[in-house]
Amino acid sequence: MANHKSAIKRHKQSVKRAARNRAVKTRIKNAIKAVRTAVTEKDKEQAQAKLTDAMSVLDKASSKGVIHWKNAARKISRLSKAVDGIE
């Protein structure tokens, strides 16, 4: 364990941030999974609704710095392409 007061504080902050980041990443995975499920079921309306939710979650995560903005853009692009491919 850290000996300096500032190091102890930094450790507490890093633990808090790690927990927050983990929660956001879980939310991202669940949103993406929901879109993929709707795409495999070929339910276009539900897929588009879930895509909107996923885009929101990804944009928020990238603006908070949890994931890189290009990573978010890539995921959104691939999900959009999958939803547009539904006939």
Curated annotation (Swiss-Prot):
Keywords: Ribonucleoprotein, Ribosomal protein, RNA-binding, rRNA-binding. One of its GO terms (molecular function) is small ribosomal subunit rRNA binding. Residues 1-23 are annotated as: Disordered. Pfam families: Ribosomal_S20p. One of its GO terms (biological process) is translation. One of its GO terms (cellular component) is cytosol. InterPro entries: Ribosomal_bS20, Ribosomal_bS20_sf. It comes from the Bacteria. Belongs to the bacterial ribosomal protein bS20 family. Binds directly to 16S ribosomal RNA. PANTHER family: 30S RIBOSOMAL PROTEIN S20, SMALL RIBOSOMAL SUBUNIT PROTEIN BS20C. This is Small ribosomal subunit protein bS20. It comes from Oleidesulfovibrio alaskensis (strain ATCC BAA-1058 / DSM 17464 / G20) (Desulfovibrio alaskensis).
